[in-house]
Amino acid sequence: MDDTIIALATAVGEGSIHVLRLSGPQAQEIIERAFTPHHPQRWQEKSNFTLHLGYFRAGAKVLDEVLIGRMSAPGSYTGEDVYEINCHGGLYIAERIMRECIGLGARLAEAGEFTKRAFLNGKLDLIQAEAIVDLIAAKTDSSADLALAQMEGLLSQKILLLKDQVMETLAFIEAGIDFPEDDVESLDRDALLQRISKGLELARDLLDGSKTGRILREGMLTVIVGQPNVGKSSLLNALMGEERAIVTDIPGTTRDEIRESVTIGGILLQLVDTAGLRESEDLVEKLGIERSWKAMEKAELILLIIQAGQELKAEELKILSQYDQSVIVLINKMDLLAGKERGEEVLENYPTQQGVWIPFSVKENLGFKQLEKEIKQRVYQGKAEKTKEPLLSNIRQITALERAVSALANGWDSVKNGLPWDMVSIDIRQALQEISQMTGDSVQESLLDDIFSRFCIGK
């Protein structure tokens, strides 16, 4: 990292201002050559984290009046000397300033290169770096809060505890291998089992929250299914707050999947409205119904809509039988019933009680609060939704931790079965390697390139 990089940190296009970020060993020299401050004495003080107004020049020609932020190494975002040039928001002006900096020795930054330098300079670990991308992409308060907790290092702290435990376990084993004649604790297999069990407990605790974390980060794939004309499209429109799907009394109106995103109780749902389930001779409708069944196979949540006062159809019973734990049954059109039937007593009409059943009416706005409560219950797995407990949410990190758990479990089995300690150490070392991959302490350059390529150019 002996070169200096520059990139536009704001979105391409016209606006009130553009921000150019410059970082590297030549950053100060480039700015000194191109920037004429309005207050030279204050500029010469070289105070850190300060803003300075002045002219940015290309030789004798003034390009713009700019505001420059100075952040000196090692206290900057990248750990290098960083200057942020705030210019007027025309893209032409920003490009002129960028070209001048490149002419003075900088080069255009690659995608994510500023954050990659921050990682390589020890300003943040890989989990914190990936959380920055998640924060930028966040679509709900919950996903933003999750990313912020990871950026603050709260998740990294828990992983560091796990890593320390596994490192101590490995040292414990290696002491037993190196000094087999000593009557020390390292020869005690029960003590070793306890150490491995502690590591497994810490790792599994992290994994337990990963489903919640992943849903908060990516959303929950939710499929709306049911017979024709039970209110599937009406529910989609109600959740969206707009007429997204066509609603008619004609069966088979929805023939293809309609996909939309909606936030309920701070949780992002990736909604799929499907074709009504029935026997049909229409080729196009039959294809839509086949897609409905395939969508259910991938769904994390199935909203099965049935019509109040009607017996369950074969397709509905099949869904309840096959996808019991994933189903919430919405007994829709409660507004069409009279008397006691409009209350909880309606549940008595359905002897099959797989899944969760909610009396519902899109027309009268009945059942939406209970639906939101049930969705939260499933996502947070009964825990308080406002918890600040850091959660795993990144599939790369989750996969690495799953491999670490597998390696620790293999090590535990090896000890229990009386295998030599050098054999046990192979599994424990593998677990340590996987945990180090999570934080970036031990990671291949190709993986780093892949991770940081997902960032925008100016980040």
Swiss-Prot record:
EC number(s) on file: 3.6.-.-
Residues where K(+) binds: 229, 248, 250, 253
Cite the binding residues for Mg(2+).
233, 254
Q: Which UniProt keywords apply?
A: Cytoplasm, GTP-binding, Hydrolase, Magnesium, Metal-binding, Nucleotide-binding, Potassium, tRNA processing
InterPro entries on file: G_TrmE, GTP-bd, GTP-bd_TrmE_N, GTPase_MnmE, MnmE_dom2, MnmE_helical, P-loop_NTPase, Small_GTP-bd
Superkingdom of the source? Answer: Bacteria
- Cofactor(s) in the UniProt record: K(+)
Q: Name one GO biological process term.
A: tRNA methylation
- Family to which the UniProt record says this protein belongs: Belongs to the TRAFAC class TrmE-Era-EngA-EngB-Septin-like GTPase superfamily. TrmE GTPase family.
According to UniProt, the name of this protein is tRNA modification GTPase MnmE
